[in-house]
Regions:
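Compact, glycine-rich, soluble single-domain proteins
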Residues: 48-61
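Hydrophobic "anchor" residues
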Residues: 43-44
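Short beta-strand scaffold segments in enzyme catalytic cores
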Residues: 29-39
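C-terminal binding/interaction regions
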Residues: 1-26, 71-117
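Short, well-ordered amphipathic alpha-helical segments that serve as non-catalytic structural scaffolds
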Residues: 15-19, 58-65
Length: 117
């Protein structure tokens, strides 16, 4: 169900944008997606994708960072693409499966018809 974004959601988007702006590397195609996940405790964790033969999505890196800090319950996640992170993108199939298996109650921020929800 689509819901309007909150100030906390915009803060999460801004963190995903910040991390990709700092780490964007299109020349080597290493880091082109940033993600941020908010735990139910309110902490935000960010990550960038890692290109390799098998790769790792930015969402997976952000979730891994949260788990290594003891977080297990998540509220919301978002991924952005591009040098400035202006494009909000949906999770890939693998990330959707991870979200379903490990955090089924986690909200995903999406862009639908040019509007974020």
């Amino acid at each position: 169900m689509m819901q309007p974004l909150t100030d906390k959601d915009y803060e999460l988007i801004a963190e995903a944008q910040r991390v990709i702006r700092l780490n964007y590397d299109a020349i080597h195609e290493n880091h082109t997606v940033g993600a941020a996940v908010r735990s139910k405790s309110g902490k935000i964790f960010a990550g960038v994708n890692m290109y390799s033969m098998h790769g790792a999505c930015a969402e997976q890196i952000a979730i891994g960072a949260a788990v290594t800090q003891g977080e297990r319950d998540f509220d919301t996640i978002v991924a952005v693409r591009g040098k400035d992170g202006s494009e909000i993108i949906p999770p890939c199939g693998n990330c959707r499966q991870i979200l379903h298996d490990y955090m089924p109650d986690c909200e995903v921020i999406l862009s639908v018809a040019g509007q974020h929800a």
